[in-house]
Swiss-Prot record:
This is Probable GTP-binding protein EngB. Necessary for normal cell division and for the maintenance of normal septation. The keyword Transferase does not apply. GO terms for biological process: division septum assembly.
Amino acid sequence: MFKFVKSSSDYTNWYFHKNSEIAFWGRSNVGKSSLLNALTSKGLAKVSKTPGRTQLINFFENELNQVYVDLPGYGYAKLSKDLKDKMMAMIEEYLLNRSNLKMLYLLIDSRLGFTKIDLEILSFLKENNLNYFIVFTKIDKLNTKEKNELNKKIKTYLEKESFNYLIVSSETKYQIDKLKENINSNF
């Protein structure tokens, strides 16, 4: 069973331990908290309809000493530029300096596909040789035509870049077990 360990705004407050950890990141309102709750089968993370709620790095741990990290979302326009810059610096510091981090799960909203900011984040991850796995969220919100469009976008992007991905739904639990298997392979 997972439990909340702590929230942190900078390096001095990180949760220090010797175990492996994985992190979840994506646009604001992409469904990070809902996905964490689907993966852990409990209301671990606070889910909000308001984007930009998570503004700290949140650490969770289970009895197997597996650590999940919930990173603040990016791209929320209503936050001040100063706060957005501070949050991005905090996340960058975490991603570039966290030796415990084994895999970053980058969440992409299936309804939007790859946005400009998602592509910028992917470039940052590649430039810094960070391990990442793409998770397309909210597939349950798409009709058949939209699912076909998403698959075309993924195929087009795969022609340019190679990446591993899964399409999931926190709501219906579609492919959540496959994602759990992937996550467990990183511990």
